[in-house]
Amino acid sequence: MRTSHYLLSTLKETPADAEIVSHQLMLRAGMIRKLASGLYDWMPTGVRVLRKIEKIVREEMDNAGSLEISMPVVQPADLWQESGRWEQYGPELLRFTDRGERPFVLGPTHEEVVTDIVRNEITSYKQLPLNLYQIQTKFRDEVRPRFGVMRSREFIMKDAYSFHISQESLQETYDRMYQAYSNIFTRIGLDFRPVLADTGSIGGSASHEFQVLADSGEDDIVFSTASDYAANIELAEAVMPATPRSPATEELRLVDTPNAKTIAELVEQFNLPIEKTVKTLIVHATEESGHKLVALLVRGDHELNEIKAEKCSIVASPLVFATEEEIRQAVNAGPGSLGPINLPLPIIIDRAVSVMSDFGAGANIDGKHYFGINWERDLPLAEMADIRNVVEGDPSPDGKGTLLIKRGIEVGHIFQLGKKYSEALKATVQNEEGHNQVVTMGCYGIGITRIVAAAIEQNHDARGIIWPDAIAPFQVAILPMNMHRSYRVKEVAEKLYADLRAQGIDVLFDDRKERPGVMFADMELIGVPHTIVIGDRNLDNEQVEYKARRSDDKSLVNVNDVVAFIKEQLV
């Protein structure tokens, strides 16, 4: 490609509304342009990167035995009503009616549609397992789109869905998809980790996320220092403390604390170690429990894990915190004065709270706290569960090493769905015994557009993007110095351009009448991994200069050896 025939719309200045590096560089490199909140035009440079990612994804999906299909982005509402998600999904599901007043949605995902295909096309267990995928645009009406294409409203996704007669068959496909995803992200050149994850609104039994490590990531990823254990912090288990509860050394005492309505204020004003305090959080209970509210207790320096808490049998899902009015009606005290003694609500305590002694907590009287609280002396030990986020230094759940926490960007997610959708939509086949059986499902998603941003977050410097070779918009840039004044430079540049293209190499030939500084800056900004600089001085010795974008290494290469040299760099 010649720059004279290309839309190379780079920017010198960083747009003011671009918050993270990938958003800034994608705008400056001319990869995207904002159309509206959460909506972006993809320009030629961006599309070239997308197509290379899609090619890798297709190859690995095909190798894993998945079949490509294409489903409409517009979906009839009756499928969503049939599955139950019409009521479950919030305003992020864009709903509309056609001219005949028939309700439709813009698809954020395609479980319903693909299950409808299978229930109409597949009749026998002999046609299973079946794995179908597509690469297609999705729409989710995010309340606050941000970070460019990292969290946009419209995005490109690879979504796959598998159908099985048994859990064993699902597990086999799940394992193949796990490996296919690992292959995809390895080939792209990302530093990633597969981690155990919560199934979220998709549902199902087992789930793994594929997280790209980056400081700008929105997820906290937990790793063991001594094993392969990795999990999203939402799912990482906080194991039972190994040290038993110490004997009581303090008397229970009621203390006036009129100006201490938070743990931080309590610690500061009364010189308490924060690990000797307990937070009491009130949430809604399930109807089946016979209670309106339930109290959750975590250590003062720990954070409640809402995903774990939701899994407690008497906690309503989704988790809803009680309002101050609800708390005062139930306890006759405000949120800053709550504690376990004489609390007229069911209580669930975190494992770490169960081994505490001589601790402080609210007295359920405004402006008062109890200090020196001890279980089984001042109150019975409450129901115990793992309801907190792990912290760095906690023991790994597999018993090997301790935990580290890093930030991650989720680029892939695989689920064992089970029968959630197939039962709702009555997707059955005839089994080996001749009876109708509901099929078991898996689903597997990759954020194609998000991969672009994640790759930039991992691969950039002050000058611009540093693409991994596999997804660079161009593999090689040819920069002829003063080509329009030097016939020799032009001749060598044209020949190298033709020779490299003949080898199937993506080349960007900068034939603009621009200053060398502008040419270099643009190629570094858009992240071309390999650059050939052609100038009269080096041609006197029949040489050109090669520069590697990632390492900044430079070397002189004989003109006749350039093609072979570049092919070696691309291996």
Swiss-Prot record:
It is found in: Cytoplasm. It catalyses: tRNA(Pro) + L-proline + ATP = L-prolyl-tRNA(Pro) + AMP + diphosphate. One of its GO terms (biological process) is prolyl-tRNA aminoacylation. The keyword Cytoplasm applies. One of its GO terms (molecular function) is aminoacyl-tRNA deacylase activity. GO terms for cellular component: cytosol. Pfam families: HGTP_anticodon (PF03129), tRNA-synt_2b (PF00587), tRNA_edit (PF04073). It comes from the Bacteria. Its EC number is 6.1.1.15. Keywords: Aminoacyl-tRNA synthetase, ATP-binding, Cytoplasm, Ligase, Nucleotide-binding, Protein biosynthesis. SUPFAM superfamilies: Class II aaRS ABD-related (SSF52954), Class II aaRS and biotin synthetases (SSF55681), YbaK/ProRS associated domain (SSF55826). The keyword rRNA processing does not apply. InterPro entries: aa-tRNA-synt_IIb, aa-tRNA-synth_II, aa-tRNA-synth_II/BPL/LPL, Anticodon-bd, Anticodon-bd_dom_sf, Pro-tRNA-ligase_IIa, Pro-tRNA-synth_IIa_bac-type, Pro-tRNA-Synthase_IIa_type1. Its main location: cytoplasm. It is an enzyme of class 6 (ligase). NCBIfam families: PRK09194.1, proS_fam_II. Consists of three domains: the N-terminal catalytic domain, the editing domain and the C-terminal anticodon-binding domain. Homodimer. Catalyzes the attachment of proline to tRNA(Pro) in a two-step reaction: proline is first activated by ATP to form Pro-AMP and then transferred to the acceptor end of tRNA(Pro). As ProRS can inadvertently accommodate and process non-cognate amino acids such as alanine and cysteine, to avoid such errors it has two additional distinct editing activities against alanine. One activity is designated as 'pretransfer' editing and involves the tRNA(Pro)-independent hydrolysis of activated Ala-AMP. Belongs to the class-II aminoacyl-tRNA synthetase family. ProS type 1 subfamily. This is Proline--tRNA ligase. The gene is proS.
